[in-house]
Amino acid sequence: MEINICSKDFIINVPSEGHGYVESDFVLHGLRIKNNTNESITLVDISFDLKSSCRIVKTINYIGEALESLVQKFYEEFRQTSIYGMGLYFGSTTFWNQSNFAKSILLGPNEETGIFNECFIVVYNSVIDELVVNVTYLKNMEKYKDSLRVPVVEYKNKNEYIFPVKGAWSTCGNYNNLLDHRPHYSMEFAIDMSQYNSELKLMHKENMDNEDFAAYGADILAIADGEVVDCYNSYSRISPWNWNERKILIEEYGFLPAQCGNYVVIKHANDECSFYGHMIPNSLTIEKGDIVRQGQVIGKLGNTGLSNCPHLHFQLMDGPDFLGNRGLPCYFSNLKDVTGMKIHMLTENNLIVHAE
């Protein structure tokens, strides 16, 4: 039995504390289970042991009908997923071999199955620091159990960052919204940013033009010193949400412009990279290869690519590849909440913050 995860060597936990307890919050983006034997096997149980300081705090099991449904649903959802979808969800186009997906819990030689975006939120008196994946199966009427131990860690940024816009902003798509950016490998900790008008409305009339939005045209700032390693400046469209229609634009312009509009990728020290998307066409003030300084204006907030209103899509990654590198939490040094209290990370969806 071969067991792999697509969260590389560890899973990122975003813990929070309160009332003497710790809430651990992490996602296993992909679990791959492959029958690497020469005989058929039957899956009996897939379980997850959540551990804190070597002690099992909670166990989650897929058995019986739940396991059968899990395998069948995985086959139906991912057997025809595009290479772009595989990159978005798992950070790799080769993590799974789609032609070898099993249709049931009976796995023939070289057949494989998996789990997509298993979310864990656990409240305990200490942080969860290890996930143990256990796979129990039958082969020739004998029961076997294989396991994989995965560290669960709290990630700390390697550099100091400022917020990519100034003033008061509404943020959404945060990591604790499990149905937005978080299922995607590089976008797990992505943030969308926009602004309300004086009446605290994002949309305040019908058929609004881009210029009617408070955020449109705002300066976008480099969050730290670095080198521009990729950018696009001439995409003028709002891409359709229909995949078949968007594929035409991908073939013409490339995946990233069709997805994110005009964008900038900056490589900072220690191989952390920031990404800024949906910018106004021809508003970029930098070019590939330029060295930028923290706080430098790199372009204007716009409404291009896969976007439903003017906003900035921002994310931090462990490399420059939107379809291959891992999303990272980003902590900011110049943020306050609406009460004036200093905060470092956006821990709630639809949070209003002020960047000094």
Short names for language-model regions:
Residues K247-I250, D290, Q315-E356:
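Acidic, glycine-rich catalytic/binding loops that coordinate metals and/or anionic ligands
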Residues V292-G305:
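Short hydrophobic beta/alpha edge segments that flank linear recognition/processing sites
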Residues E2-N4, T285-K288, N303-P310:
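Short glycine/proline-centered loop/turn elements that form peptide/ligand docking sites
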Residues E272-G295:
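Short histidine-centered loop motifs in beta-beta connectors
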Residues D225-I280:
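Zn2+-dependent peptidoglycan hydrolase active-site motif and core
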Residues A214-Y216, Q259-C260, L284-T285:
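Short, small/polar residue-rich loop motifs at catalytic or cofactor-binding pockets
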Residues M1-A224, T339-E356:
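Polar/charged, compositionally biased leader and regulatory segments
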Residues E227-V229, G302, M317:
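Conserved positions in beta-strands of structured domains
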